[in-house]
């Protein structure tokens, strides 16, 4: 895939940013995503997923190609973060409604977010990030990782120095942290997602479909199960991240 000069400049800026690192309740649940979706709705989600894939391929491509570990790290980070941001956006449209997110404050002053609505989009519904990604990994012959162990690790490290530091498959290192990926790529990718999707409850689905597409094109160079492990090691902690930590 070739890029024009503007894309090349933007891609170079993104790589430089990642290498440098970062700069200095009881409300009702979000309605479950139904098993039936309209053709028009899915068309928008699919268009959004294609934009995610196209843009990331351009931004991440170097002379050596697209590093697949980084690709899945970015996709997982954005997918997880989109679950929380989708809930926030949905409830911002409702008068006097607080998002159903449970706030956890640590001794060092950091804030993290948990809750059933978050888990539903991330791992429990038919169209959750996990459901879409794991089912496709199995279809391609991969073995999904132990998701409960990933959740347990994130909960155990919440507030500590190991929070948001993924444990990647052996031989599959990813250079940057998930929070760096969110900080760098969210503002570049999310506008297209919002443009095509029918609402915030579909954002995470678009990222899930983009993860499926990435598995399809990379299955010859990375086992789909390993790709899925990278995705979820990034997605779970980023779903709980305080948006203020990335300037939102």
Question: Where are the language model's segments positioned?
Answer:
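Solvent-exposed interaction surfaces and binding hotspots enriched for charged
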Residues: 2-248
